[in-house]
A protein has these predicted regions:
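Short beta-strand scaffold segments in enzyme catalytic cores
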Residues: 341-343, 412-421, 497
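Short, flexible loop/turn motifs enriched in small residues
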Residues: 334-337, 410-414
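Short, compositionally biased leader-like segments
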Residues: 387-397, 500-506
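Zn2+-dependent cytidine deaminase-like catalytic core
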Residues: 428-530
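Feature captures the catalytic ectodomains and active-site-proximal regions of enzymes
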Residues: 1-387
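Short, basic/aromatic recognition patches
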Residues: 393-408
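RNase H-like nuclease fold core
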Residues: 415-434
């Protein structure tokens, strides 16, 4: 794949996780909740296979879904935007970010007031719309800043744009960010500007997040280091504190986020387009607006076909979420839920992946699809979902042809191998048996020795097939000796295609194979590097 479009439907949870009660959640299910609303529309997502995901039996399934689908369980100890996105990018957080159910401690506020020159109001967990109703008038009269938090790890500053201009509010947020470190390192400091008069205050689009930097290397960092594009649409750049981003596209609504993502399809680039659609969470989940959430989902569902239609041959679309925010559970906080995973593209096999542990699965899968070695703390699904590409098809067919020349009068088992060199040449080999048994040479070594004898020392891929009576019959992995010989010239990352040959149609059997690597076949192996000085 050349381009991956990763779209986070912010807060679209699909059912409570087993540990939800530890996070204060019970009977939460964001998607099921909005599916009961008359505004809910589901046609495009149904065709992709959303109703086929584990736990979504209340939705109609699809006999032949277009996407590979599954359900992801979060491993991090949290249910907020920052930790959710960090895990999607490859980092699992074993400890939750600090929260302040009783407000921020005295030493934090005193330092903040000293450095800003302004006193503060509130200092309690509050709804963003309710806090300006309660304190907005006093703020306008006194100039005191409205500081509040929520169940998430956030330090929020609300201020009227006529009292505190946006640039000044952002400076205050930077001051707060510099103070909130160490044990008080909240996930985000958020600017919450508003306008209007008492009784009719309205929050504006000038929100800005000042996030804690990720504690380790992310998928975004890896792709940027490798020279690939990382285009951040919506609040992605804010969430990652600008790290690992090559392009930033600001948006103010789901509609604008979808529009900018669609425009990116027309560009030529290699890498990742990472979009967050925040309205689901900010406008509807937190505000307990089931109808609004359902309507926003319907708008996305209606938009989706225009995106799918414009996708190119080597594009991959990944749809997922970062946490839940059930709009009908009676409170305004995020919810600890599974999130959906849908992967669509012309190179994707539409399989049901079941339930997988770890949002970091997304980072590992995207990385492998883009040819990056990064895996983070996730396990890639790419080998399970990728359809054979032209290079793989050619290599498997070459191995199959080599199998026809096998000399195996004693075992009756014919094996063929094809080794792809770094310069694009294919070297084939078959097993050659001997009456004395020990001089027998396997197909893999035959192919490798042929290549090495012609001066080739660098390889990109290996394919192996086998069977009896020259009929493919199951997987034939390399023997131990072959694995050691291959290790002499090949890295543990060498892709290995093990032909399964389960199809009764010989023309199709060559396309049925299992992807693995030399390292997976030969873990903790001994190589020449251990003998070098």
């Amino acid at each position: 794949m050349k381009r991956v479009f990763l779209i986070v439907l912010d807060s679209l949870g699909i059912g409570e996780e087993p540990d939800a009660r530890l996070f204060g959640d019970r009977d939460c299910h964001t998607l099921k909740r909005i599916a009961s609303a008359p505004e809910f529309r589901f046609e495009s997502m149904r065709r992709l296979g959303m109703g086929n995901i584990d736990g979504q039996e209340y939705l109609p399934g699809e006999a032949k879904p277009l996407a590979a689908v599954g359900r992801l369980q979060e491993c991090s100890m949290g249910k907020d935007t920052t930790i959710g996105h960090w895990e999607l990018s490859g980092i699992v957080s074993p400890s939750p970010l600090p929260t302040y159910p009783n407000g921020f401690p005295k030493e934090i506020l005193e330092e903040f007031q000293k450095r800003t020159g302004r006193e503060v109001l509130c200092n309690l967990p509050y709804s963003g719309t309710e806090v300006i109703k309660a304190y907005g008038k006093e703020h306008m009269e006194t100039g005191k800043l409205i500081v509040y938090t929520s169940a998430d790890s956030v330090f929020q500053i609300a201020a009227h744009e006529e009292v505190v201009p946006l640039p000044v509010l952002y400076d205050y947020c930077r001051i707060a960010r510099s103070i909130l470190q160490g044990k008080h390192a909240v996930g985000r400091v958020i600017a919450r500007p508003f306008t209007g008069a008492p009784g009719s205050f309205v929050r504006t689009a000038g929100r800005q997040d000042f996030s804690l930097e990720p504690p380790g290397k992310t998928l975004l960092d890896a792709l940027k280091e490798e020279g690939k594009t990382v285009c951040a649409i919506g609040k992605i750049s804010d969430i990652f504190a600008g790290r690992g981003i090559t392009e930033k596209v600001a948006t103010h609504s789901n509609a604008e986020g979808m529009e900018k993502t669609l425009e990116t399809l027309d560009r030529n680039f290699e890498g990742l387009c990472f979009t967050n659609l925040v309205d689901f969470d900010m406008l509807y989940g937190h505000r307990q607006d089931v109808s609004g959430y359902a309507r926003a989902f319907a708008e996305f569902d209606t938009w989706l076909p225009s995106f799918l239609k414009k996708m190119r041959e080597e594009d991959l679309l990944v749809l997922t979420a970062d946490h839940g925010c059930d709009p009908g559970d009676g409170h305004t906080d995020h919810t600890r839920e599974y999130v959906p995973l849908l992967l669509f593209g012309k190179g994707v096999r539409p399989v049901n992946l079941g339930t997988r542990k770890g949002f970091a699965t997304v980072a590992a899968t995207v990385a492998e699809a883009l040819g990056s070695s990064y895996r983070g703390q996730g396990k890639s699904l790419w080998k399970e979902i990728a359809l054979p590409n032209k290079e793989e098809k050619a290599l498997v067919k070459a191995a199959q042809r080599a199998m026809e020349h096998s000399y195996a009068p004693y075992s009756g088992v014919q094996v063929g191998a094809a080794l792809l060199s770094s310069d694009g040449r294919i070297f084939t080999g078959c097993n050659i048996e001997n009456a004395a048994y020990t001089p027998t040479v396997c197909a893999e070594r035959t192919a490798l020795f042929k290549a090495v004898s012609q001066g080739v020392r660098s390889f990109r891929m290996l394919a192996v097939c086998g069977g009896k009576n020259r009929v493919l019959s199951g997987v034939f992995p390399p023997c131990g000796v072959c694995r050691q010989v291959l290790r002499e010239f090949c890295s543990p990352d060498l892709p290995v295609l093990l032909v399964q040959g389960e199809s009764s149609d010989p023309a199709e059997s060559s396309l049925e194979f299992e992807r693995t690597t030399l390292g997976e076949l030969f873990p903790r192996s001994f190589g020449s590097e251990f003998l070098s000085e």
